[in-house]
Amino acid sequence: MIRQTPYSKENEQKNNSEHSANRALPPSGEPEGASGASFISHSLSLPLQSVSAVLTLLNEGCTIPFISRYRKERTGGLDEVQITDISELYDRLKELGKRKETILKTIREQEKLTPELEARIHACMDSTELEDIYLPYKPKRRTRAQIAREQGLEPLALAIMEEAKKPTAPPDLPEGGGDKLASILQKYQGRAKESLSSRVHIGTPPLSGRSGGAPLPLSGESEGALALDIIAEIVSENQQARNTVRTAYQRGAVITSKVIKKMKDTDEAQKFADYFDFSEPLRRCNSHRLLAMRRGEDQGILRVSITIDSEECISRLTRQFVRGHGVCQTLVSQAVEDSFKRLINPSIENEFATLSKERADEEAIKVFTENLRQLLLSPPLGQKRVLALDPGFANGCKIACLDEQGNLLHHEIIYPHPPRNQVRQATEALQRMIRTYKIEAIAIGNGTASRESKEFVGNSLTPQPPLRRERGREALPSSPEGGRVPMRTREDKGTLNLSQHLSEVSASLSPPLSGRSGGASPIFLISEDGASIYSASPVAREEFPNEDVTTRGAISIGRRLMDPLAELVKIDPKSIGVGQYQHDVDQSKLKHSLDQTVMSCVNQVGVNLNTASLHLLTYVSGLGPALARNIIDYRREHGPFTSRAQLKKVKRLGDTAFQQCAGFLRIPDAKNPLDNSAVHPESYHIVEQMAKDLKCTIKDLIGNKKLLAEIDVKRYLTPQPPLRRERGSEASPNPSERRGGAPPNLPEKGGVPMRTREDKDALNLPQHLSEVSASLSPPLSGRSGGALGATLRDILTELEKPGRDPRGEVEVFEFDKNVHTLSDLIIGMELPGIVTNITNFGAFVDIGVHQDGLVHISQLSDRFVTDPTQVIRLHQHVRVRVVEVDMRRKRIALSMKNIKQ
């Protein structure tokens, strides 16, 4: 449902503008096309035409990755984030529509639905406002006010409220103050009159305690007290009154936490020591602090409350229902105070507790999904033979040797560390495996004994004695010619150039210890988070039914180096350890966001159709578990796919699914080279025409900058009609879906400066497209509603570098060899580190002492930082300075200020 976030000025202004929009949803519960799109366009500040196009595509069954990648003309070039925002708001609108239908049905059954009330409900676009409208009609348990109504006291209560709104001056004489109340009481007979008149001394104006007089003696189950209960409930259900209290919470709510005394000295409570006596304005409370307090509350350690200035709020409420002074005014004032304390304030406090938790959840989920995206898009090593080592002491180091496809070749356990200390046997075994299985890289888990294992492996790879330090540099082994390899200084260690480094090391070794020619096997530290959970999962048991959990864990570590994305999709993202308070947030929202993130990453990278696992295929646009399983079955029965067209032969994979998935699936050895690119099959005819016009094959065209420079882009542009629908007509079909031949040529309206043969080797494709765009009328832009510029731009970019991997290249990293434990740290020393987690309050960095240090957001950069992800990324190699070390709590404070990265 659409919810306010009621403690921010920006949100307050935004909500007011949304209320003023006054757009309605139809009775069906589905957002009406025009009004729904208009509301989304207004809320997200996006063009209405683009929003309408996205909603149309979503309703046609298109996925977000497909829309953002292959329908840029129709959406005006909206990116994946914007399309996701549209989709999520549209879903909330649909939920709001369903809630309206439920409310209308309930009120209709009570025979209280008027045309005005129905129109008001339809016009409401905010869930909080909708619930306020519904509150007087909402079925309740038997309240004090209902008991009073059953005794016929509602007319009396309404009469008192009406009289209290009439301005009156304070009586000059005490005996005149009760005249109005007496006249009201004369209209009512029975116990109600007797009870109320006996408790209110007519003739003496009874003022409330807050006004300086004695409080009214109305209490218990008397009819008079029950009449005031009716007034209190009426006030509590008044939308204006509730908004008055909300405004007070928006502007001045304070969240407070205090430790429960009996828990203060327990070990479990110490992690919440910062919140034993804590208070802060709610609007300034960061999500991680709020979630920490709520966790402490859930564990029975903290007591958390949200408060406002009650006296000021009661005064504001009273002015809404009382004018002047008198007995009726005093009675209503007392009822208003009772309403605030007993009904409104607890309700609004609970509302703000819920909404603040939702806001904190959203921020925590955002941090988690961004970290997950960075982790999934970590650079892969690629198809190399890998030796994976899961380090350990007493239980030994588990080793798995993998081939280029990640298949298990061999596994065993070595014991180079205490208590066994079988260094010689372990060294011989390691060298034997490297040579036997032609190992090209080594992956070591970053858990227990990781530093010791990395040093052991490094010594085993080098036949020379251990390196010694000389004046801040490593002592260098002699080359066969007696030369020296220039080693890197401390400042260089965080960012090694892998190919250059391997070349230097290779030249220094005699002979180099590597399974294949080209230098020593590089060593990488790999995160173990989630590996143990994967090794015991049904997925791992299905993949390796005959191996134990330790071997499966080592295999997972090796595969994470080869292709992090392909391996991590098998693991529950919550087990990967890159979030903050992920177990405290709304789990359904978290799962939805994480699934969307995984799908986005998988489709951004693309998937090898012939080697992808079931889990990887599941996240491909348009597929899902059932179709992914059918693809695996088809592949097992018929062998590898040779073309994308074969996908149509897969069971239950129809035209729609093919359209959605084809562009994201790659076939490296396909007959048509475009099948191994991001060019969608619906655009093959454009590339075919380009090749035909250049009198070459598609294979010759791909990657050939000279030929690409000769392409006259204007020849392949197709005019696009405006997105706006007029007179009920459907939007014109996307020209990218045209079949049969190249798009018609546009008339010449100006020359495009074509490049000479001398310029073609230095083709700058973006610049070339920019020149073409500037020469066109209309310009090469999806937003103009003109040519298919975005699609052509993507096609030409893909032809220049087909099948490129957006994830970059993996880098070698080295910890400081002098630092192994907390006791080795010295305040002020600079160290290399790896970013292991990012939160909205800073980043955690592994510096090799088995305890990550925190770089607070204020220490991330020399400039002011509001979002850590703007200056740092997960697994980034950084240099940090030690600021503080707390040995008792095992906490390390680090800084990146004034350090060149």
Show where each model-derived region lies.
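Glycine-biased, low-complexity coil/linker segments
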Residues: G29-E30, P174-G177, S208-S211, S219-E221, ...
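Short flexible coil/turn linkers enriched for glycine and charged/polar residues
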Residues: P47-L48, E60-G61, S127-T128, R141, ...
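A glycine-rich phosphate-binding loop feature that marks nucleotide/adenosyl-phosphate handling sites
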Residues: T247-V254, L389-F393, G447-A449, I526-I533, ...
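Compositionally biased, intrinsically disordered low-complexity segments enriched in Pro/Arg/Gln/His
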Residues: T5, L173, L196, P217, ...
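Long, highly charged, low-complexity intrinsically disordered interaction regions
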Residues: G36, E95-K112, A119-H122, I533, ...
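Structured, non-catalytic alpha/beta "coupling" segments that mediate domain-domain communication
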Residues: T106, R120, L130-Y134, G296-D309, ...
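Single-stranded RNA-binding regions, centering on S1/OB-family and related RNA-binding modules
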Residues: D675, P681, I686-L717, N764-H768, ...
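Duplex nucleic acid-engaging cores and interfaces of nucleic-acid transaction enzymes
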Residues: I2, F66, Q82-D85, R92, ...
